[in-house]
């Protein structure tokens, strides 16, 4: 199991942090604004 070998700790931590930061960036810039735009459009349509 490479997770328990100390040689792989830095590699796993580096790419883990890289993957998490890329995922967080994509979610905050692409996915959440689209969902927010959809929710605002739905609430304004129902209030009309």
Curated annotation (Swiss-Prot):
UniProt keyword annotations, A-Z: ATP synthesis, CF(0), Hydrogen ion transport, Ion transport, Membrane, Mitochondrion, Transmembrane, Transmembrane helix, Transport
GO cellular component, one term: proton-transporting ATP synthase complex
Transmembrane parts of this sequence: 12-32
Disulfide bond found in the keyword field: no
Record membrane topology: Single-pass membrane protein
One GO MF term: proton-transporting ATP synthase activity, rotational mechanism
Disulfide bonds: none
Task performed by this protein: Mitochondrial membrane ATP synthase (F(1)F(0) ATP synthase or Complex V) produces ATP from ADP in the presence of a proton gradient across the membrane which is generated by electron transport complexes of the respiratory chain. F-type ATPases consist of two structural domains, F(1) - containing the extramembraneous catalytic core and F(0) - containing the membrane proton channel, linked together by a central stalk and a peripheral stalk. During catalysis, ATP synthesis in the catalytic domain of F(1) is coupled via a rotary mechanism of the central stalk subunits to proton translocation.
Quaternary structure note: F-type ATPases have 2 components, CF(1) - the catalytic core - and CF(0) - the membrane proton channel.
Full protein name: ATP synthase protein 8
Name of the gene: ATP8
